[in-house]
Amino acid sequence: MDLPEPIRRRLGDFSRTVFVDQSRTQPSFEEHANFLDQNKDVVSSLPLQMSLYFNMWFFPFWWISEVVMLDLKYSALADYYKFILITILIVMTLIEAIRLYLGNAGNLQEKVPELAGFWLLTFLLQFPLILFQLFNEAVLVQPLERGVHIILALFIFAEVLFGFVALRTMVRHTESRFHLRQFHGIQELRT
C-alpha cells in the first residue's frame, strides 16, 4: 500500500531537509535538480538490511562458539566428520564475509547483480550448510551449538525471504525505469 501523494511529497521534502548536508557550499542549480529528483524512489529493503546488520554482529559469536565446541568434541568425532566440520567452518566463514558484503552493497546501492549474488550464496550454500550442522546428529551437536545454529539459521532464512522480496522489487523497479527511459527516447524522436 503506497502513501498518498501529498504525504509522500512532504516526507520526501522532510527527509531531504534533514539528511542532506547543509553545511557545505550550496550546489549549482543543475546539481541540486539532479540530486533532488522527485522520480527516484528508494527500493532498498529495511528488513533485509536489519537482518544483515544483526547477522554481521552475531556471526563472530557464532564462529567463536563453533570453534570452541569443535575443539571440545574433536577427539570423539569420526575422522571423516573431523574433515567435514573443519571444511564447513572454513567455507562458511569465507562465504559469510562475501555474502554480507554483497548483501549490503546490493541492498544499499540498489545493485541487482550484487543482491542476486548474495541471494544465491545464501540460498544455495549457507542455508544447506547450517541445516547440515543443525540436524545431523552424527556430528555430536552440543546444546550451545544447537542454540547458535538455530539463531544463525533464522537469520539466514529471514535473509532468503527478505532478499527474494527485495530482489524482485528491485528488478521490477529497474525494469520500469528502463521502459520509461525507452519511452522517453521515443517521445524525443517524435518532436
Curated annotation (Swiss-Prot):
<keyword id="KW-0969">Cilium</keyword>
<feature type="transmembrane region" description="Helical">
    <location>
        <begin position="147"/>
        <end position="167"/>
    </location>
</feature>
<keyword id="KW-0970">Cilium biogenesis/degradation</keyword>
<dbReference type="GO" id="GO:0007224">
    <property type="term" value="P:smoothened signaling pathway"/>
</dbReference>
<dbReference type="GO" id="GO:0035869">
    <property type="term" value="C:ciliary transition zone"/>
</dbReference>
<dbReference type="Pfam" id="PF09799">
    <property type="entry name" value="Transmemb_17"/>
</dbReference>
<protein>
    <recommendedName>
        <fullName>Transmembrane protein 17B</fullName>
    </recommendedName>
</protein>
<keyword id="KW-0472">Membrane</keyword>
<comment type="subunit">
    <text>Part of the tectonic-like complex (also named B9 complex).</text>
</comment>
<dbReference type="GO" id="GO:0036038">
    <property type="term" value="C:MKS complex"/>
</dbReference>
<comment type="similarity">
    <text>Belongs to the TMEM17 family.</text>
</comment>
<dbReference type="InterPro" id="IPR019184">
    <property type="entry name" value="Uncharacterised_TM-17"/>
</dbReference>
<keyword id="KW-1133">Transmembrane helix</keyword>
<feature type="transmembrane region" description="Helical">
    <location>
        <begin position="115"/>
        <end position="135"/>
    </location>
</feature>
<keyword id="KW-0966">Cell projection</keyword>
<comment type="function">
    <text>Transmembrane component of the tectonic-like complex, a complex localized at the transition zone of primary cilia and acting as a barrier that prevents diffusion of transmembrane proteins between the cilia and plasma membranes. Required for ciliogenesis and sonic hedgehog/SHH signaling.</text>
</comment>
<feature type="transmembrane region" description="Helical">
    <location>
        <begin position="83"/>
        <end position="103"/>
    </location>
</feature>
<keyword id="KW-0812">Transmembrane</keyword>
<dbReference type="GO" id="GO:0060271">
    <property type="term" value="P:cilium assembly"/>
</dbReference>
<keyword id="KW-1003">Cell membrane</keyword>
<dbReference type="GO" id="GO:1905515">
    <property type="term" value="P:non-motile cilium assembly"/>
</dbReference>
<dbReference type="GO" id="GO:0060170">
    <property type="term" value="C:ciliary membrane"/>
</dbReference>
<feature type="transmembrane region" description="Helical">
    <location>
        <begin position="50"/>
        <end position="70"/>
    </location>
</feature>
